[in-house]
Amino acid sequence: MINLDIFRLQSFYSLSNFESHDALKEKLLHQISLADNVPMNWKDKYYDDNIHRCDWDLGEDFKRTFVKEFLPPLNDHLDEIGKAFSLSEVVLRQIWYQQYKIGDLHGWHNHAGCQFTGIYYLDQPKDAPKTQIITPLSDEVITIDFKEGDILIIPSYIIHTSQKNTSDKIKTIISFNFDWKNIFSDSLLKFNQHLN
């Protein structure tokens, strides 16, 4: 048996307005309407997930039309957010869309193989549910107070859910997994002061 000591670290999530939202929303929704679709249906003793339209299986294909449209402003946006955390050089791992019709849900889950997960709320009906996250170690459930056009960034180990869609309108998100590869040099010089 192992001895395990657990110590608290502060974690975070960030919520920011995507400045290109108004210019891109209708174009991205149209491109997604024409995109490949692999509905997600997971049903076992743990999950009863159903996502009406999705291309998660194609997440590593960056040549899809909506991805090529979305990536340049997304990378600029993530570069700006990274500055707040002293991190630079975004490495995108996967990107995909999900569309939820009434009754669809994506149960509690996390993301592997990346440092961070992002959710861009492309089309969020007013009566559609908000993303919820579990606070590590306390198991407190937090409902994220976002609005359409926002981007949520969470560490990829954070357990989160998109609860059952109660709206009769389609909810559309673009999700992405990524890393920040480096530390800004100015920050690194500051951090080096703590080295012996």
What are these regions (language model features)?
Residues 14-20, 25, 49, 53-54, ...:
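Residue-level detector of solvent-exposed, low-hydrophobicity positions
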Residues 195-196:
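Short, cationic low-complexity segments
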Residues 1-87:
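Non-heme Fe(II)/2-oxoglutarate
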Residues 89-158, 163, 170-172, 180-192:
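Catalytic core of non-heme Fe(II) oxygenases with the double-stranded beta-helix
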